[in-house]
A protein has these predicted regions:
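Hydrophobic alpha-helical transmembrane segments
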Residues: 1-91, 194-195, 211-271
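Helix-loop-helix units of permease transmembrane domains in multi-pass membrane transporters
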Residues: 86-120
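Hydrophobic core positions of alpha-helical segments in small-molecule transporters
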Residues: 41, 111-112, 124, 205-206, ...
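Short, Lys/Arg-enriched, Gly/Pro-containing loop segments at transmembrane-helix junctions
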Residues: 97, 144-146, 266-271
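Membrane-helix interface segments
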Residues: 105-107, 198-203
Length: 271
């Protein structure tokens, strides 16, 4: 056996190990009851925002009105917290963290939890949005997907996309946008779980945070978080509409990461 064959033989178990870890990650993140519950809750919040628009004949109006004219949007952070944000608290409560730390370092354990929560937060919000898009023809059978019936609900930076009827890009933009916010809401709930040992507080804190930031934004001359979640401002281009939320939610997610690592390492030393 030559040197190249030996290298291939040695690399095969490593590749299988990586594939196994990826499969476990996908299974524990997406194929769970909590992920399905979070996606259904997200879809339900969209539907609640459209309760007064049952007679609408425009698909685009139904989709836009579900967030633009709805007060239920403050419940969206709970959806991102459903799949994985409580895992850290449950591991501590059941003393599973002690068993996990026998096989890996504290830093790796906390990083894995944080990444899984961020990915699941993005995915559950995106899945809920896509599920709502699929339910619109069922809940609103008279709604027609046409630019001619947009009724002033389209933001200027997406006007050309809607005129070309590139609906994949149009709805994909909003799905990506709500997914970005889902990353932050998920890791925020995870960070709270490292400091607070109460399930209700973990779920309620992101809602209160969103409401408080929206209340303070006009006084601080800033864009509100809910406005950035759904691009409710008149940006010049779609790149700006995507960049502002990315910077805002990304920077706050970094702060959550630092707070979670600090408290998580301290909790692991005390356990």
């Amino acid at each position: 056996m030559n040197r190249s064959e030996k290298a291939k033989t040695a690399a095969a178990p490593a590749r299988r190990n990586v594939l196994h870890r990826i499969c476990v990650f996908l299974k524990e993140t997406f194929l769970t009851l909590r992920f399905a519950e979070g996606a259904l809750l997200c879809c339900g919040i969209y539907v609640l925002g459209d309760l007064v628009w049952w007679g609408a004949k425009s698909f685009l109006y139904v989709f836009g009105a579900s967030t633009l004219f709805s007060s239920f949007i403050y419940l969206f952070p709970v959806c991102a917290a459903f799949p994985y944000a409580l895992r850290y608290r449950e591991n501590r409560k059941n003393h599973l963290d002690y068993m996990i730390l026998q096989r890996c370092s504290v830093f790796r354990y906390l990083n894995t939890l944080f990444v899984r929560t961020a990915v699941s937060g993005f995915a559950v919000m995106a899945a809920g949005t896509l599920l709502f898009l699929g339910l619109i023809p069922v809940c609103f059978p008279h709604a027609v997907l046409s630019y001619e019936l947009e009724e002033g609900i389209i933001m200027p930076f997406l006007e050309t996309v809607a005129q070309a009827e590139n609906w994949f890009a149009y709805f994909g933009f909003y799905t990506l946008l709500i997914g970005i916010s889902g990353v932050f809401w998920g890791v925020l709930a995870l960070t709270v779980s490292a400091w607070v040992d109460n399930t209700y507080a973990i779920y309620i804190f992101p809602i209160l945070f969103l409401y408080a930031m929206d209340y303070a934004a006009p006084h601080l001359h800033l864009y509100s978080l809910s406005g950035q979640m759904f691009a409710m401002y008149y940006y010049e281009t779609w790149q700006q509409a995507l960049l502002y939320p990315l910077v805002t939610f990304g920077s706050m997610s970094v702060l959550c990461y630092l707070a979670f690592i600090y408290r998580g390492r301290r909790n692991c030393r005390e356990s």
